[in-house]
Amino acid sequence: MADSAVIFFGPRKAFDEMVERETAEDERSVTYLESIHVARIKSSDLITRDLVLKAPERVDSCVVHADDFGSVLSHVLPSFATILEQTFDVGKLYVQNPPKRVFGSLKASQPQGTLDVVHYEYPLIEKKRLNDIYDKLQSDVLGQDEGKESLIASLYRLAAMNEERPSVIMFYGPSGVGKTETARCLSEAVGGELTRVQFSMMQTQEAYEYLFGAEHSKASFARDLLARESNVVLIDEFDKVDPRLYNMFYQLFDEGRYVDTNYDVDMRNALFLLTSNFNSEASARRAMGPAMFSRIGASVHFCDLGVDEKVTIINEHIEFVLSKLDEEDRATIEQSDVQAWFIEHAAKYDNMRTMKNKIEMAIFKKLSAPIILSGRKSV
């Protein structure tokens, strides 16, 4: 097998940075997919026997990304080490987020003392960072003062208690008032892009396969967790999750461990943010049941925004759209009544996402009106 091997669990960016630090530009490096090509494993082939007749080519390193495993058939996974050994004589092997069968193959094939397992260290939420987090929430998220205070209190508890188990916080309230934006803002403040899961976009069978792990080549919750860039995970519209799937979250929220068919994920010290449209904690408890609700460490209420806050959003979003337009179109909108109309009717909008869409449609209807008028005249 390889002279030495590193198994890395964590995001691709950090994995690539590690490989770049440890390899030289003039090294002969290959990917695992090149190994598959050399081994002539096609859509329905097994490992060819004549490979042993030719000595494997010596290479300095072999780099295997998590996505590579989705490009091969399932019979390749337990034969991972065998295929590589028969095609290349590898100096150092780097593998990101291998499925359990590949991990087992590597542990069995690598000589003792030549296999290192590296877990990416995600930034923790520390007390000294709470001021910066609160300042970012204040600047990026309008209103929701009580919700922000409850969130900071929950984060303080997470930092002070220093428990390895994950922290689970539920945001509840009407749609389009800043729940998802708050989660995104928090992830940026902690460091890294937010990992967002939307179960409302999945049918029951699709959600089942996503959670339990079906084919290794398909998207899965475990694979997305392994690839996360920050330790903040947003499960959007958790109230839309089929209650029959709740048991998949019990061990995750209790112990910080998630196991499916293909992966075993360490999620200790993670922060899970669950958004929902429940109008109260009582309604959430009734809908979710005591077993699921008791695993939520804190519930943060998001209320409807005030008129002044809605006007601020209107002005900011119109300015954002105008920044994308050329000078002529910008002048047309500035001279129109679009902005004044939305400010006058701000109170009627409860969902800010819907309001922004309406603003954009009003702007582009105004700009496209001459095209429609010209077309009608030519008929």
Role assignments for model-derived ranges:
Residues 110-114, 312-328:
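Conserved AAA+ ATPase "sensor/coupling" helix adjacent to the nucleotide-binding pocket
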Residues 4-30, 165-197:
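Walker A/P-loop
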Residues 105-125, 192-194, 286-304:
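A short helix-turn-beta junction within AAA+ P-loop NTPase domains corresponding to the substrate/partner-engaging
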Residues 90, 97-103, 217-221, 237-245, ...:
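Canonical AAA+ ATPase core
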Residues 127-168, 361-367:
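Pre-Walker A (pre-P-loop) alpha-helix and adjacent loop at the N terminus of AAA/AAA+ ATPase modules
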Residues 44-58, 212-237, 262-263:
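Conserved alpha-helical scaffold flanking the Walker A/P-loop in AAA+ ATPase domains
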Residues 1-120:
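N-terminal accessory segments that target, anchor, or regulate ATP-driven/P-loop NTPase machines
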Residues 189-217:
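AAA+/P-loop NTPase substrate/partner-engagement loops
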